[in-house]
């Protein structure tokens, strides 16, 4: 899909860069290091060398601050970029020929509630939208997280045991199917409305605010999403979906 459209940068909101005081943006032109997954160090080790659109990141930082949200630019050259950013950007654009902007997830749901998280994520998304519009750049927005997030807590004797390749339980699956059906119907405002209950019932990674941020930054789409797939990862539910605002390039993908 991305090979068929013209864009200047990828803007990604990641739940795996968790900040507890404000929202942070990568703020140096380049980050280069080795990422080792803190959960599965035996499975994920990645040498990255990524470029950041600092101008756009600073514009988002400024607009976010104007909205009353505490913000900070990450300018530590030794900062380890999170694996959510790395895996999502690599799978979407393995050539890494576009600059990125990475946004941290401020953990309001931990301090307060899912409702507070939603309001903050909305304000952040709207601020980012204003910054993008003022910049005149074309960007791809990425929300990197699972849907339902209950997962197995013991490892099978055979690491790739296919009998364990399923959603944790049926209630998680039913919730995910409900959300995906609403994606297909273009009912994104309704998704936003039920997000607190969905997040609580499924322990979803939506609790970081990524999906709400993206919907707010897109003006809450009312058109259908392109659904590319749904699959389990150690019991969690994962959906690949795309909201294309261009009616000429939007496809019916079920």
Residue ranges and their predicted role:
Residues 1-8, 20-123, 154-254:
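Flexible, D/E/H-enriched segments
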Residues 8-14, 103, 137-147:
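Beta-strand elements within well-structured catalytic alpha/beta cores of enzymes
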Residues 15-18, 145-150, 156:
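Short, internal active-site loops enriched in acidic
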Residues 59, 124-128, 144:
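Short, hydrophobic/aromatic alpha-helical segments in well-folded domains
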Residues 126-135, 139:
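Non-transmembrane, aqueous-exposed alpha-helical and coiled segments at domain scale
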């Amino acid at each position: 899909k991305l090979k068929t459209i013209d864009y200047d940068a990828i803007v990604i909101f990641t739940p795996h860069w968790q900040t507890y005081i404000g929202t942070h943006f990568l703020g140096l032109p380049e980050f280069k290091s080795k990422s080792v997954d803190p959960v599965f160090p035996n499975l994920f080790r990645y040498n990255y060398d990524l470029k950041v659109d600092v101008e756009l990141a600073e514009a988002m930082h400024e607009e976010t601050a104007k909205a009353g949200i505490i913000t900070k630019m990450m300018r530590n050259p030794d900062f380890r970029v999170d694996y959510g950013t790395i895996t999502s950007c690599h799978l979407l654009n393995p050539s890494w020929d576009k600059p990125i902007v990475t946004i941290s997830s401020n953990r309001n749901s931990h301090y307060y509630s899912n409702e507070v998280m939603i309001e903050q994520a909305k304000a952040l998304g709207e601020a980012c939208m204003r910054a993008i519009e003022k910049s005149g750049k074309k960007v791809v927005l990425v929300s990197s997280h699972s849907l339902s997030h209950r997962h197995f807590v013991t490892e099978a004797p055979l690491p790739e045991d296919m009998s364990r390749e399923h959603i944790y339980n049926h209630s998680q699956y039913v919730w995910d199917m409900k959300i995906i059906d609403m994606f297909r119907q273009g009912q994104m405002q309704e998704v936003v409305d039920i997000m607190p209950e969905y997040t609580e019932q499924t322990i979803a990674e939506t609790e970081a605010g990524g999906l709400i941020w993206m919907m707010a930054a897109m003006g809450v789409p009312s058109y259908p999403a392109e659904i590319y797939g749904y699959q389990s990862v150690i019991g969690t539910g994962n959906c690949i979906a795309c909201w294309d605002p261009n009616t000429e390039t939007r496809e019916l993908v079920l």
